Amino acid sequence: MFKNLAIGAAFALALAPAASFAAGGGDQHIEDFAFSFEGPFGTYDQNQLQRGLQVYTEVCAACHGLQYVPLRTLADEGGPGLPEDQVRAYAAGFAVLDEEANRYLYDAEKDEFRPLIDSDHFPANHAAGAPDLSLIAKSRAGFHGPYGLGINQLFKGIGGAEYIASLMIGYTGEEKEEAGTILYENTAFPGGWISMAPPLYGEDVEYADGHSNDLHHEAEDIAAFLMWAAEPKMMARKQAGFVGVLFLTILASLLYLTNKRLWAPHKGKKH
């Protein structure tokens, strides 16, 4: 029985790299992007995070909030790494909508919302009924291995960033109306139709670093930024995991040598 289980597990692992079934079924197409932060030693590309922040600010922020992301983290070394004065200026210029979640920013004496400061979070934005994007990269899965096993995540991660980028480039241009709502065909969305109009077309923003701003690159940049927003401490966790594995390896080696030195000579002896 155990032999059969071992053979089955080995067979599943052999198939895992090739198995890339989309989350929720086989009718989605999730493209496998080569993000810099993937893998055990991957790190965020600071320039890409800055470009993604620009895409969010100039495009996505019109409908989506990031209310669980502190503005001060934009200066983090492992994040976008903006200078502190630039973060303060960015915060002060960010528009705040009149929503219940933003009431703590309301100045009753001046009868208006006060400007944001770097110790605040990004403001909430539910005006269009759109979801908050703070944790969207963790709540969406692009890859699954053989059903129920989750083996593909071992090699590729859950694919939240891939799902977001694939969604951005997955619009086919086809539209239909259902119950008075315009739906847009999207090859990455479950069911194939989504109520969100295409947010990106390519050349939507002008990057200061001169980087290509076609649709594919804009999609990659916003996906990477949202992955950082959801997992700002990913690099620290990877480092801690590496140190933990190294420590356990050394400990296991010492225990083996101790056993060999102290107990191995006495094993098998008859008393």
Model-derived features: where do they sit?
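Electrostatic cytochrome c docking/interface patches
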Residues: 29-54, 65-79, 210-212, 230-238
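Detector for the c-type heme attachment site
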Residues: 64-69, 197, 201
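Extended, hydrophilic extramembrane loops/domains of integral membrane proteins
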Residues: 188, 194-231
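The canonical Cys-X-X-Cys-His
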Residues: 56-67, 222
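Bacterial N-terminal signal peptides that target proteins for export
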Residues: 1-9
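Juxtamembrane interface at the cytosolic side of transmembrane helices
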Residues: 237-271
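N-terminal signal peptide c-region/cleavage motif recognized by signal peptidases
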Residues: 15-19
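Membrane-proximal low-complexity regions enriched in glycine and acidic/polar residues
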Residues: 98-190
